[in-house]
Curated annotation (Swiss-Prot):
Transmembrane spans: 7-24
Keyword Transmembrane helix attributed: yes
Pfam families xref list: p450
Cellular component GO terms held in the UniProt record: membrane
Name of the featured protein: Cytochrome P450 monooxygenase 69
The entry's keywords: Glycoprotein, Heme, Iron, Membrane, Metal-binding, Monooxygenase, Oxidoreductase, Transmembrane, Transmembrane helix
Gene3D superfamilies listed in its UniProt record: Cytochrome P450
Cofactor entry: heme
Biological source species: Postia placenta (strain ATCC 44394 / Madison 698-R) (Brown rot fungus)
Subcellular location: Membrane
Amino acid sequence: MVISTNELAALTVVLLATGVLFYANSTRRAPLPPGPRGLPLLGNLFQFDVMRPYPQYLKWAQKYGPVFSVKLGGQRIIVLNSSEAADELLATRSKLYSSRESPHVGFDLVSDQQRMLFMPYGREWKIARKNVHSLLGPGPSKQMGKTQDLESRVMLHDLLCHGETSITEEFVEGPRGEVPERHWFSIVRRYTTSVVMMLVYGRRIHRIVGNPELHKVYDLMSNFTHVSQPGRYMVDALPVLRWLPDMLAPWRAEGRKMHKREMDFWGKLFSDSRTAFLNGTGLNGFVQSYLRARTEAGLEDLPGNGATEDAAGWMRDKLITYTAVTIVEAGSDTTSTGVFSFVLLMLSNPDALQRAKEEMDAVVGSSRMPDWEDEDRLPWLTACIKETLRRAPPAPLGIPHKVDEDDVYNGYLIPKGSTVIGNIWAIHMDPVRYPDPTAFKPERFYNPDGKLNWASGPDAHNRDHYIFGWGRRFCSGKYLAEASMFIVLSRLIWGFDFYAASDPQTGKARLPDVSDVDTFTDGLVTAPKIYPVGFKPRSEKHAEMIKASYRDVQNDWQSMGLAGDER
C-alpha cells in the first residue's frame, strides 16, 4: 500500500462519507460471507501484503471455507476458494459476474480506459474481444504453428550458445524484476515475445543483447501488473479520493506519466505499423490487417478512444493500440513464466525430469526434433507441464471480476459492485482435489492413453488447472500459450541436459525453494526470480542438429521477408 502525506491528510476528509457506506453495508438483509474482523472504515487494509495477498488468502480460505469476504476501505472483496464456487459464480452465472473492478490508476490513468483486460463488460469490450478472438481462438491460433516452430528452433540455438553463462557470470535482477539481457531468462523472453510480435505487428524480435525493445516490453508489463494489483493505491480502496485536487492526489500525476511511457512505446509500434501500411511496406500483422479493413470501409483516419457508434463498431486508433497490447500481454507473459517455473520444478524433481527424457528418447529419438504430432504421444511431458501450471500459477488470484447485481450463494449475499476473486492458489492447493498439493506430482495428470484435457477445454468442472480464468473472461491467449509451451519445452527436454549451479561447499544443486514465496516476484503476475541454469546438448548429434536447424531457419526468415537473427 502506497500512502503519501497528502493522502493521509485527505483520508480525514473522506472518513465520514466512508462511514455512511460502512453503515449501509452493515444493515444488509442477508449475511455476508465470513471473513477476518477488520478495522472500522479501513477494513482489512493492513492485515496482509496487498502486493502478495495469495499466501494470506490461502490461510483465510482454510479457516473460513469456500467463500470469504474482506474489506479494503470501501471496497468489498469476495474470494472464491473452491472450483465449485468459482465455476458456479464466474462461469454458470457469468451474466452477472463478467465485468471488472477496474483499478483507477492501472485502468483509468495508465491505460486511458482502453485496456481490454480491465474493461467493464459492455460494447467496447465485446468489440475488442471479438477482434482478439479472431486471432487467438482455437482455429486461428493454429496458424501460428510455423512461427512457434521456427522461433523455438532459434531459442534452442541461443541456449546452445549460452551454455553455462548464467552460472559462470554474476547476474542481479533489477528492483522491479528487470532481467539482465545476457541471462537465460532473456533468451526465453525473446522467444515468447517474438511469437506474439509477429502475430500483432508482423515483425520479429531478432536480437537479444543491445535490444531495448525486448526489455521495454517486459518493463511495461511488469509495471502494469504492479500498479493494477488490488489495494496497491489508497484511491482504489477509497474511490471518493478520486475527487481530490491534483495537489492532494500524487497518484494522478504518476498514472499519467506511466500512460505517456506506454504510449511512447506501444503508441509508436502502432504508428510504425500504420506508416508501413500506408506506404505499402507493411507485413500482415493484426494491426496492419485491421487498418486495411478499416480503410476499405472508408475510415482510414479514426483517431481517439473507443469505437464508432454504428453497427460495424470500428475500433479507433487508441483502442487498436491497446487491443494489440492485450494480445502481446496474453501471449508472452504466461508462456515465459511457465517455462521458468517448468525448469525450476523439473530440476527440483530429478526423477520426473529423467522420466521425461526417457519418454522423449522412446518416442522421438535423436534423429529429429519433436513436433506437433508428437503431443499425444508424450503424455508424461504433458503431465509435467500441467503440474507446473498447477503448482506455480502465473497469476495466483487471476484477474478480479465484478458483480453487477446483488446475488446470493449458499445463503451468503454477494453485494452488487463487489470485487469477486477466483482464488486459483487456494483451488490448486486444495488437498481434496489435489492430494499432497505442495508436492510436484505429474502423475496427477498422467494419461498413457494420450487423451488430453487441457485447461482450455470446455468442461469447467474437470479442468486440470485454472490459470486461464472463468466464464466470458476466460483468457484469450490460452491456445497460443499452451502450444508455445508444448513445442519449446518438448524440444528443451529433447535437446539439452539442463542443470543448476552447484554449491562449492556441498556439491549439491543450488536452487530456489519453490515453497518460498520470495522465490517469486509479487504483483498481479508472479514469476520465478532469476536463477542460474546451465545448458549442455545431450549429444554431439543433438548439437549439430540444433545448429543446422538454426541455419535453415535463417533462410526461412529471408524467404518470408523478415529480419534474420543477429547474434
